Amino acid sequence: MLDEPVQFVHTQQLDFKKSVLRYLPAQSPQGLLNKKVLLVGLGAIGGYMADALTKIGAGIESDFVLVDKDQFLAENVSRHLLGLLYCGQFKASAIKQHLAENTFFQQKKFDVKLKTSHHLIQSFLRKTILI
């Protein structure tokens, strides 16, 4: 016999790809699936952009490259997506970690660059849909 009553738990299967496609407009039914995306700068605006782009498919089936050489500092907390937990980390790595922990997204296609090089940008200009 159990000492406590049995509690029923509701379970639900989550399909991130379906959840991304569900709310996209008809003129762009695939969102950023299969699109290579380069995001340079992960400050107050760039951090929120990375989060939003992930939620519409960036990096699910193609590359999503995050570029920022700066470290996240305590003075950034009031205006940034990241919180105190990430202070002292490089922004690109911290954003990648945040997205891995806070979305259904499997971060297999993420690449993190701490420096922007002319060569990197040139190579992406030839094959990237969104910069």
Tell me what each language-model feature is.
Residues 12-16, 41-46, 84-95:
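Phosphate/oxyanion-binding active-site loops and adjacent basic polyanion-contact surfaces
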Residues 1-36:
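Glycine/serine-rich phosphate-binding loop and adjoining beta1-alpha1 elements at the start
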Residues 65-105:
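Glycine-rich phosphate-binding loop and adjoining beta1-alpha1-beta2 segment
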Residues 96-130:
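A structured beta-alpha segment of the ubiquitous adenosine-cofactor-binding alpha/beta core
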Residues 24-28, 53-54, 119-122:
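Generic recognition of flexible, low-complexity loop/linker segments
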Residues 48-52, 75-80, 122-124:
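A short acidic (Asp/Glu
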